[in-house]
Structure formats: C-alpha cells, structure tokens
Curated annotation (Swiss-Prot):
Name this polypeptide is given: Putative kinase Y4mE
Listed Gene3D superfamilies: 1.10.1070.20
Taxonomic superkingdom: Bacteria
Gene Ontology MF, one: protein serine/threonine kinase activity
Annotated Gene Ontology cellular component terms: cytosol
Alphabetized Pfam families for the sequence: Couple_hipA, HipA_C
Membership in a protein family: Belongs to the HipA Ser/Thr kinase family.
UniProt keywords, alphabetically: Kinase, Plasmid, Transferase
C-alpha cells in the first residue's frame, strides 16, 4: 500500500497534503508555496506554518475534529463501509464541504469554480423531500454515501448541511459550498427543536452574537434550520467559505477528550487561547464571559470546547458566533453538571460568591466586572423571555413545551443573580 494523499484546498489554493501511510498513520505537511507566502495563515492555532511535517498526534485533533463524533461517526462509517477510527478514509468520502474554508480532495480532483447559487442548479426540496432526509439521517448521517455529496460537520447530533435559495432548502451539487444546516430533533429527548430555537433566539434578543436559526416543519415533522456563519454571499450571489476552527482544534485536543473532566479545555484554557489568538482579545474575552454566564442561566450543561469556535475573517481571528445552545437541564436523563466548571463549580446549586471569584481569576478579569456582566445579563434575560415567546409563538409546534423551557430559564435567572 502506497501513501494515500488528500490535497487540502483553501480558496482555490493548495495549503498542503493530508496523508496516510501504509501503516495507517496520518500526517500533514504544508506546501512550499503556502509556506513561502507571508500572507497565508496556518490551518490552525495548533498547526503553525513550518516545513517539518506534522505527526498523527499533532494533526489529528484538527483533522479528526472536522468529522462527526460518537454514534454519528460510527453510523456514518458503517454507511460508507469504512472503519470509524479511520479519519483519512472518512475525510476522503466526506471532506468536500467541511466546517471552515477547507476542502479535502483526492489528488486528481480540484474544487469547482464558485458561481451564483441558482446558476449551479442545486436540487430543491419539497416537503416530501425533506421528510425523506429526516428519515434517512438516523442510518446515513450527513447523507453519507449519497452520490455527489461529500459533506462533513463535527458534533454528536444528527444534522446535514444544505443550501438555501429564496427561502427554500436544496441539496448542494457536488463541491458546492453549503449555506445552512438542517438539524432534526434528537429522538431521545422531546422538543429539542423548540428548545434550541428558543434558547438561540433568546441569546440573540439579549445581544449575544449567535448563528441565526429558524424552526420549520415538513408534513408535521419539526426541524431546525441554522444559518452557517462560516459562509458569506457576495453581491453577485456567490457563496464563499470562511475559515474557522473550534477551541479543541485550536488547542490540539482530540474530539474524544472534548470534556474538561476528560482532559479537554477548561474556561481558563479558553480565555488564554483568545488572548493569544484573537485580533480583538478584550472584546472576545467579554464575549466568552457572557456565554458562560448565559449557559448557566439557561442550563446548557453541554458547552464543551467544541461548542466554541474561532472565525478567521478578513478582520483577523475572532470568537465565532455562538451555536448549539440548548437547555440540557430540561432532560433528567442528561447530567446537570457543566461541561466546563465555572470557578470549580459544576452546577447552579453549587454556585456562590467564591465560585465567581475563582472564575474571574480564570478569566483574567476583575470580580466587579463579572458581577456587572451577571446583573446585566440576568436582567436582560428575564425581560426578554416573554418577548421572545410572544414574537415566535407561531413558529413552535409544541407551545406547551416551550413555555416550560421559558419558565425554567426565568427561574434559573433569579438563582444566578442570588449566587453573586
């Protein structure tokens, strides 16, 4: 078996080569042209530009972090007929459209030239077509194996990237940059579509930077449509990819250890990362601070290192909009413990003034600032809950369930205020 190669493309240029040798070991090396151009960026904060190739241990957190996780990875691999542990084989089949600006393609392929979306003639989906996708995702995550589709997204939840044209969802043509993500409900937990839509819109209502979401349904089947923040459409209607990486990728942490309790990033690690990488660290530190407080208020205990990202746009690296915000405490079968401790506290019941003092030190900010952010965010959340419910009540299939979520958030907001 010879060395297998995937060219890593970024905006029409080869960044380098992702390889797998005859022993199954993966590696990555930047191309000479990419290294010689002082205007090019590294793929990741964990993969600085250098001539020496990167080993499996060094490059796997980034490349493995482009793929689905946990059961989604297993079922995807089964659908493709490859080993779930084989990152190269999975990216060979799925790497045509991933999170960020990259495309991973075989040596004999090049990216298609971008053009206005309608000119590329993606396949439109009627309600029956959407239902077919919803039915297929449990056994074929990301529609893995469907001819012409090479799509990947990280995460343990079922989802598939699509394009949106004039408000209508469509399957992309081969190599086309997707613009939105369709997320079906999580089968084990009722109401996750309504839950995530409400929490994401609540975050937007109080001024947090979040990915826009829209709850929809097809033949009575609910799903969520999330706008991709790592894409932009120019004046001619051409969709461009923007590079991004999650905090685990940036810190060189494999997706299997994304939780802080397993060696994954802590909030201290995340704040230090932003100060090191961000072009506007003061702004982004406050953005992460607010996100931590908001997640405690709404009961999103699953905010681990892969649920925060860095976006590399033309203004420099910055913290990406928030995504995957869900009130996980609404489901008794899920652990109420926060994925990343806040000042050594893992639940709202444990949170106290000493916890906030420790958290302020981890964030590298003063306790008075943390208290002001808590007060402002709690007050804004309490005021916005009813307004968000009223403004979006017609979008939710299960209004009783979303009212329950809203009541829970309002109650938690009061407890967070008392904890300071």
């Amino acid at each position: 078996m010879t060395v297998r190669v995937l060219n890593v493309w970024w905006d029409g240029r080869i960044v380098g080569q992702f390889t797998q040798d005859r022993h199954g070991d993966i590696g990555f090396a930047y191309s000479e042209a990419w290294l010689d151009d002082e205007n090019t960026l590294p793929l990741s904060a964990s993969l600085p530009k250098r001539a020496e190739p990167f080993s499996r241990r060094e490059c796997r957190p980034f490349f493995g972090g482009l793929l689905p996780e946990e059961s989604q990875r297993l079922v995807t691999a089964q659908a493709l007929g490859v080993s779930p542990a084989n990152d190269f084989a999975l990216l060979d089949r799925l790497g045509g459209d991933v999170a960020g600006a990259l495309q991973l393609l075989p040596e004999d392929q090049e990216p298609i030239e971008a053009g206005p979306l309608p000119d590329q003639q993606p396949t439109p989906l009627d309600e029956a077509g959407i239902v077919r996708i919803l039915d297929a995702l449990p056994t074929r995550p990301l529609l893995a194996g469907q001819e012409g589709l090479r799509l990947s997204l990280a995460g343990a939840q079922s989802k598939v990237p699509l394009v949106l044209i004039d408000g209508e969802l469509a399957l992309p043509v081969s190599g086309q940059a997707t613009t939105h993500i369709l997320k079906p409900p999580i089968a084990r937990f009722p109401g996750t579509t309504e839950n995530e839509a409400f929490v994401m819109r609540l975050a937007a209502a109080i001024g947090l930077d979040v990915a826009p979401v829209e709850p929809r349904s097809a033949n009575g089947r609910p799903f969520l449509v999330v706008e991709r923040y790592d894409r932009y459409r120019d004046a001619d209607g051409v969709v461009h990819r923007i590079h991004q990486e999650d905090f685990c990728q940036a810190l060189g942490v494999p997706p299997e250890t994304k939780y802080a309790s397993e060696g994954g990033p802590t909030f201290k690690d995340c704040f230090e990362l932003l100060r090191r990488v961000s072009a506007r660290p003061a702004t982004d530190v406050l953005k992460l601070l607010d996100a931590a407080i908001f997640n405690l208020v709404v009961g999103n205990a699953d905010a681990h290192g892969k649920n925060f990202s860095i976006l590399y746009d033309d203004q420099g690296p910055k913290m990406a909009p928030l995504y995957d915000l869900l009130s996980t405490v609404a489901y008794p079968d899920l652990s109420p413990k926060m994925a990343m401790r806040i000042g050594k506290r893992v639940t709202l019941a444990e949170m106290d003034a000493d916890g906030w003092q420790t958290f302020a030190k981890e964030a590298g900010v003063g306790l008075p600032l943390v208290r002001r952010r808590i007060t402002n965010l709690v007050d804004s959340t309490a005021e916005a809950v009813a307004r968000v419910l009223e403004d979006t009540s017609d979008l939710y299939i299960d209004s009783a369930r979303i009212n329950h979520f809203a009541d829970s958030v309002a109650g938690r907001a009061k407890l967070v205020r008392l904890s300071i």
